[in-house]
Amino acid sequence: MRRNVILIVAVLTGPALSPASPAAAAGIRTHVQMCVEALTQQLAPEKIPGISDLFADQEARRAFYHGCMFPDWGFAVQGMKDAAEDAHWDKFQTRYLEILKDRFPLPWNGEAKREIAFYLGAVAHGAQDIPWHFDGPSHPSYLRLSEKYDKLNHGETEKRVDALVYIRYHREPGSDPLGKPDCAWPFGTLLAVYGPSHPEVTKEKLQQGCQALAAGYLGTGALGELHRKELPKKHPWNAAHLADYYYGGIEAGASMTSMLVSRYFARLRGGVHLQRDIAYQKPGEFIPFEGVADAHVYAAQETYNTGLEPLFELTGDGPGDERYGVIRFDLSALPARIPVGSARLWLYLAGRRGNPQTAPKVIAAYPLTQAWKEGTGETDGVAGFRGVPSTGGGISYKDGVGSIPGDPVDAVTIELDAPVGRWISWDVTPIVRRHIAHPEESFGILLRETRESAGGGGVLQFLSSQALKAQTDGYGGGARLGRRPALVVMPPGPQGSRYGAAEPTCPTLSCGPPARPGSAPPAAPPPARTGRAGSSRG
């Protein structure tokens, strides 16, 4: 055993896998751990019908982790670098999705679940790479900070972080999610996806790439085992922050994975999952979906705007403290007059402030009846909620947008002892259907307490579409990104319904509290990653 470990490390650190080599793939073990944490800590399966059933299948889960490795396959195979690069981006992913939809209609059997899970892992890998490799507006990439603080280049960072991942997460017996990776890839489907644009890709080349990734995965584990005491001391920034750096760390990658897996799974079922992305690199590597606007207003500061605050407040703190929220999703991608099975708005309840909650809070959802502008009001990118005087037409209480237009489409009661740190949802199907029939009359959703509820104390705070950092220093983790407001629209019929009579419980998924049934229409996806301009991967 010792001899085998030494041989693996010799291969890992020899010329074939030197830091400058394309075979020093983008942190394969790190990618897998991001996918593990997405399933166990970030993904909210109650939001997407059918997704819990998919990942309750252990073989599908293993296929998902293998898919998280897949896109880097060609960096270790001569002449396959372009094919590997393309596997990271939307053109490849969209063709892949269409082939899966054609080959595997519902209901999905075991083979279909494994193929779909593998695909979702591949999508996750590409998303994880963006903040790892590339700076965003005011967001330094993970690789940039690794170079700054630990003096490690691209390839060195990825090998050593993989070894640190092994030390922290995979060293204990039974904790490695893959153990020994295999090459049971869906080669036939992959060849069909590659066929039109990459005829040079063969099953033999894919197998060669798979074997190289498996060797790298095992090799970084061996490196971590042999140097488990020295590596954390030698690379202190990476050892301290590989998980909690908000832009590119493991938690951030898991959060991004949960968003993309939800988005593409909804597309596979003929629906749409809308959630605001970070404006990563734009234009170029990534065209983010930014079509979500939200703000809350309150009577105590009737000219204030909160459009860029990370916290979204929907209830007052007792008599006279009137406040309400508005939210709008860009539904322009929805085909005209498409049948809608269900549509649900999901908000993440982050906390309470002010006086103790003295009675149940009832928050109702209504269609908005007039136009409004999100605005740029911001006081604190971590804990802000107060806003600043409105400029440039940003919505404020004085605008009077919150007039109640009749009966609500849905209302949610939040009890005194209801826990925070969970998703809350409203059935907004009538509002989405109205938008499809009369888009010129669609202005979004109004969320406010009912008159009977408004007298009680306690302000309920949800995460807004601007929520990102949990600490000012950037080391509070990246979970907030995947907990921004979401609209899930699913079609009628089997695609938009749950498997069987009830959604199965997945014991190792963080399914959270049970949600009321819901979903909504089939729709074109939001703008996605396109092209590969300026790519520097591998």
Segments from the language model and where they lie:
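Proprotein-processing/basic-patch segments
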Residues: 291, 429-512
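Extended, low-complexity, turn-rich repeat/linker tracts enriched in Gly/Pro/Ser/Thr and Asp/Glu
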Residues: 348-359, 453-455
